[in-house]
Amino acid sequence: MRNFLDKIGEEALVVEDEVSTSFEAASILREHPRDLVILKNLKESDIPVISGLCNTREKIALSLNCRVHEITHRIVEAMENPTPISSVGGLDGYRSGRADLSELPILRHYRRDGGPYITAGVIFARDPDTGVRNASIHRMMVIGDDRLAVRIVPRHLYTYLQKAEERGEDLEIAIAIGMDPATLLATTTSIPIDADEMEVANTFHEGELELVRCEGVDMEVPPAEIILEGRILCGVREREGPFVDLTDTYDVVRDEPVISLERMHIRKDAMYHAILPAGFEHRLLQGLPQEPRIYRAVKNTVPTVRNVVLTEGGCCWLHAAVSIKKQTEGDGKNVIMAALAAHPSLKHVVVVDEDIDVLDPEEIEYAIATRVKGDDDILIVPGARGSSLDPAALPDGTTTKVGVDATAPLASAEKFQRVSRSE
């Protein structure tokens, strides 16, 4: 993380005033949604809070050494060309001891939150059968000085825990908090269960990513600001939530697995990374890695796809814009169907020509305004499975999905040519 802070060259908003981890800190973060914020003086902890490392596409592009419109292609490249880790070090430079969450400035963000939440913690675990390492970011609610309730959706970590519980065993884990944006982004990618997110991160780092070996668990993790070691307990569940999710609304309360922590390692002059729930950092980290998934699915249908964006107005989750070089009539509708299938949470998708910048909401609106004929170009799919994060979805989880083909007809393409782009 420190190398990225040196690289970014951005003057952080540094708050010297004493603030509380309960609501006050989060209130400051909400007031500065695009800034890199450092809270130096927390009432409850000697460790400063940093937030906003990944709250713009520009910062993410900088961490990936690419331009903003190349982010999707850069992620696809790393997912398809992972680089094995060759360097593992020790915990030099850390102070180690018994895990005690009361030492950390873990924020309580909103009034109805179930408790303080770790929001930038990456859980590292191994497949009990194969030993393959998995890294994934999860929200974790504090329920004791050494215990967390963790939200685990049915993906890779969920499968690992199932395997361990079938054996009657706990699942060993490490939690890393405070790493560089490229490594953090890699932990959110959708790769096969037998692949390693750290090898994706290593490709982002041109093969130069070094991990550190934990003391009490069989795990190697990035050299994060804070590293916790422990176990997800076999068969133990606690109530988790409420928690404010992507849509700025409360997620439901569930019975979720429990983590018991044993060891804690803190770097000298550590900073605690906090992601504001429903803020841009939360939305980009969760949504942006789905763009390559949509891109690859669309490319199988229409090879001339140019870019895919999950828009910020759609919480980087529910709305997508896709640009293509249209070859035949019907390409737009095929893209709509491919995109909806690739990302089941997607609710509305707009397909535009390659002259439209999908990163610019005004450009997308322009395409809809000038190239859409409602009775021909809008595809409506009622009764489709939607997102659990969509407050408008029905109790059974279904919703109505909409696709808008905002591409110009090929037969009269000249009529739609934009003068400002051609003369």
From Swiss-Prot:
Q: Which UniProt keywords apply?
A: Decarboxylase, Flavoprotein, FMN, Isoprene biosynthesis, Lyase, Manganese, Metal-binding
Entry binding sites for Mn(2+): 134, 197
SUPFAM superfamilies from the UniProt entry: FMN-binding split barrel, UbiD C-terminal domain-like
Q: In which pathway does it act?
A: Isoprenoid biosynthesis; isopentenyl diphosphate biosynthesis via mevalonate pathway
Q: Name one GO cellular component term.
A: cytoplasm
Molecular functions (GO terms): carboxy-lyase activity; metal ion binding
Keyword Manganese present in the record's keywords: the answer is yes
Q: Which reaction does it catalyse?
A: (2E)-3-methyl-5-phosphooxypent-2-enoate + H(+) = isopentenyl phosphate + CO2
A GO BP term here is: isoprenoid biosynthetic process
Question: What EC number is given for this enzyme?
Answer: 4.1.1.126
Which InterPro entries does the UniProt record give? UbiD, UbiD-like_C, UbiD-like_N, UbiD_Rift_dom
Tell me the Pfam families matching this sequence.
Answer: UbiD, UbiD_C, UbiD_N
Active-site positions, per UniProt? 245
- Endpoints of the signal sequence: none
Q: Which cofactor does it need?
A: prenylated FMN; Mn(2+)
The record's family statement is:
Belongs to the UbiD family.
Give the protein's biological function.
Catalyzes the conversion of trans-anhydromevalonate 5-phosphate (tAHMP) into isopentenyl phosphate. Involved in the archaeal mevalonate (MVA) pathway, which provides fundamental precursors for isoprenoid biosynthesis, such as isopentenyl diphosphate (IPP) and dimethylallyl diphosphate (DMAPP).
- Provide the protein name: Anhydromevalonate phosphate decarboxylase
Species, as recorded: Methanothermobacter thermautotrophicus (strain ATCC 29096 / DSM 1053 / JCM 10044 / NBRC 100330 / Delta H)
